[in-house]
């Protein structure tokens, strides 16, 4: 029975999703398609990697999971509830893909690629909405026993009110809401915008160190719920020594570096505001401006063509299309650093010229 279930839930084809952010096959040297902090890696992470004791490499990582949970509880101030460590949010997403009946899962659209790969065909929409809302999440919870949504939202950058998410989960006690907070550290107040620490038993939180701390080569994160039985049900039995001791050593050092985190966060917020202004001035783009995270999202009928122009300048941007629930197609672009702006603007000039020459450019407007 178990083998039949797994066979029916094999990893789907990559067709339709395009190259994910950071994929080296893009052939670019300024990769704004991946949402990793461009000011990373955190210096403390690099220092930790250089100074790791030989014994920590020699021996099995017996206490790696415990150390990661300890630093997460320290950083967030959440001491209650059940928390387990894993290899980023990805481990938990794919574990659910193996453990759950896919027919029970709703993924509000548009959505992060891995949700739609782990749960093929489970995209949820009420009326073709393109920007997530709490009302959409509420409707999804009413339609199925489990809903997974990212907050801040990938790919749109929308930030839903955590208290409202808790309230809608509480209103559907027979369903479970999984909130992936992989981008929460990019917000102005990560603890305040998180659902972590709520007292309802049917809300699960995922977090990851990979993106914000600029250490995506390491795989470290956690899952939390007020009810430990939920974690067992969703993720099953974790493997022995599943976490790399080296990854955890690096991740813990990065999380403890509050000063760098605050400085980096401020710089990215400034960069993102600059990018929003630039995109708002390009006819043919319809930006959904946000002040929540380090990337911007814009609808564009010719998103693939625009991405190719950027690629010709050695710049990677992410195209979202029908496979993600985006209609029309859209672009997700991480804000370039201040020292990268001149080169980025050169590509923008070519994009604007190409859209104008095509006759398809419309006056720039905000979503």
Where are these regions (language model features)?
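Active-site phosphate-binding strand-loop segment of PLP-dependent enzymes
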Residues: 131-187
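Short, conserved charged micro-motifs
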Residues: 43, 302-309, 339-344
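PLP-dependent aminotransferase-like
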Residues: 98-150, 155
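PLP-dependent enzyme catalytic core of the Aspartate aminotransferase-like
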Residues: 163, 312, 324-367
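PLP-dependent aminotransferase class I/II
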Residues: 40-42, 202-281, 287-288
């Amino acid at each position: 029975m178990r083998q039949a279930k797994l066979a029916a839930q094999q990893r789907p084809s990559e067709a339709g999703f395009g190259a994910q952010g950071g994929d080296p096959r893009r052939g670019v040297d300024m990769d704004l398609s991946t949402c990793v902090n461009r000011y990373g890696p955190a210096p403390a992470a690099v220092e930790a990697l250089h100074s790791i004791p030989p014994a920590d490499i020699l021996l099995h990582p017996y206490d790696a999971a415990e150390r990661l949970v300890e630093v997460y509880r320290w950083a967030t101030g959440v001491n209650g509830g059940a928390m387990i460590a894993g290899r980023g949010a990805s481990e938990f997403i794919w574990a659910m893909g193996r453990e759950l009946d896919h027919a029970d899962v709703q993924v509000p659209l548009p959505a992060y690629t891995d949700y739609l790969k782990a749960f093929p065909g489970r995209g949820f929409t009420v009326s073709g909405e393109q920007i997530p809302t709490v009302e959409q999440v509420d409707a999804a919870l009413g339609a199925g026993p489990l809903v997974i949504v990212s907050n801040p939202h990938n790919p749109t950058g929308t930030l839903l009110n955590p208290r409202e998410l808790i309230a809608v989960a509480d209103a559907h006690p027979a369903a479970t809401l999984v909130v992936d907070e992989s981008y929460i550290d990019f917000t102005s107040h990560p603890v305040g915008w998180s659902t972590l620490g709520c007292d309802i038993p049917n809300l699960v939180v995922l977090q990851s160190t990979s993106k914000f701390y600029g250490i995506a080569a390491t795989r470290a994160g956690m899952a939390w719920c007020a009810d430990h039985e939920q974690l067992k049900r969703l993720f099953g039995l974790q493997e022995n020594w599943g976490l790399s001791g080296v990854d955890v050593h690096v991740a813990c050092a990065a999380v403890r570096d509050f000063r760098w985190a605050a400085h980096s966060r401020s710089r990215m917020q400034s960069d993102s505001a600059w990018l929003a202004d630039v995109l708002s001035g390009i006819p043919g783009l319809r930006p959904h401006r946000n002040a929540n995270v380090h990337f911007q999202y814009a609808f564009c009928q010719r998103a693939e063509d625009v991405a190719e122009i950027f690629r010709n300048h050695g710049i990677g941007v992410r195209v979202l299309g029908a496979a993600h629930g985006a209609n029309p197609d859209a672009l997700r672009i991480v804000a370039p650093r201040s020292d990268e702006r001149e080169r980025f603007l050169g590509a923008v000039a070519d994009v604007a010229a190409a859209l104008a020459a095509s006759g398809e450019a419309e006056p720039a407007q905000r979503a």
